[in-house]
Amino acid sequence: MTITGSCHCGKSAFRIEGEMPAQLTRCTCSFCSKRGVLWAYYAPAQFEPTTPAAGDSIYRWNTKLVAHHFCPVCGCGTFTDSPAFEPDGSWDKRTRRIGVNARLFDDFIAVDAPVVVIDGKNLW
């Protein structure tokens, strides 16, 4: 199935080849908490920006391992390109994943999905 979504103004849009998430992830790190994002994770090959990537802004902090993409016009956090961290914060040093803000999916009510909490506040 194809999932589509975009930021509020539509300048940052995307397409995912995959299923709607069975669960979402809420990270408690300072950045994710302030953004209010609910993450759905996909393999990089499943995710495709449908608007020019050059239009996105990217924020990196702390270890600089995670690229947080957001729309420079409306400010919505759209997706991250990050290591495929395990819930305990470990990483195999090569596998990456795309975390997509499920609140931006078209035709999906994110609050209806179960949420897993990652203790990002204490992990990184």
What are these regions, as identified by a protein language model?
Residues 1-6, 11-124:
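A short Gly-Trp-Pro
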